[in-house]
């Protein structure tokens, strides 16, 4: 759906904004798996980077649609949008095609103790810009962030802060992280 809000002054439009939204329900159950609109919905997924040879990240609607068509041709119904905010065009395509989306911020590979403010800003913007997309069902906090180990107290604190922020801004969606197992078993 598209919701349009118009600001009138003396009967004339002085501002107008439109936003897309949709309605759905989901649950994640340890025994039943992913449940979409009350029914089991097995997830078959891909991970997507938003780039192409020769044009980098400057994809047009044509390339986004080509990517979505290929993803659908594979039979996928789930997309992890790695590792950064993607184009609104692609989020809209995900909504239109009924995809289940994992959206995440660029908090990748190695934790930078001085980078907390940046991760908080990135997550805030991701949620503010995309919370109306019904295709997004999970917010990703980080990707393979334990490459230097998982025992750094500031890494753990940053994840707690991000997790708390997400649940404050959007209590309807869970959080997740992608983990690379390069940690000692004791960490």
Stretch-by-stretch model annotation:
Residues 4, 8-160, 175-176:
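Active-site-adjacent substrate/metal-binding segments within catalytic domains
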Residues 146, 156-187:
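Extracellular glycoside hydrolase catalytic/binding regions
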């Amino acid at each position: 759906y598209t919701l349009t809000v118009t600001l009138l002054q003396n009967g004339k439009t002085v501002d107008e904004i439109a936003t897309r939204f949709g309605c759905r329900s989901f649950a994640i159950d340890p025994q039943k798996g992913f449940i979409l609109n009350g029914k089991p919905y097995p997830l078959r997924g891909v991970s997507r980077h938003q780039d192409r040879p020769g044009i980098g990240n400057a994809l047009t609607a044509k390339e986004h649609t080509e990517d979505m068509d290929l993803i659908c041709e594979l039979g996928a119904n789930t997309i992890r949008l790695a590792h950064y905010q993607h184009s609104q065009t692609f989020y809209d395509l995900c909504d239109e095609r009924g995809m289940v989306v994992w959206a995440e911020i660029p908090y990748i590979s190695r934790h930078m103790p001085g980078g907390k403010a940046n991760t908080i800003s990135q997550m805030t913007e991701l949620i503010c810009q995309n919370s109306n997309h019904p295709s997004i069902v999970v917010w990703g906090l980080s990707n393979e962030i334990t490459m230097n180990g998982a025992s750094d107290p500031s890494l753990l604190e940053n994840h707690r802060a991000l997790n708390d922020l997400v649940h404050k801004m959007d209590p309807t969606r869970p959080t997740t992280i992608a983990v690379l197992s390069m940690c000692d078993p004791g960490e």
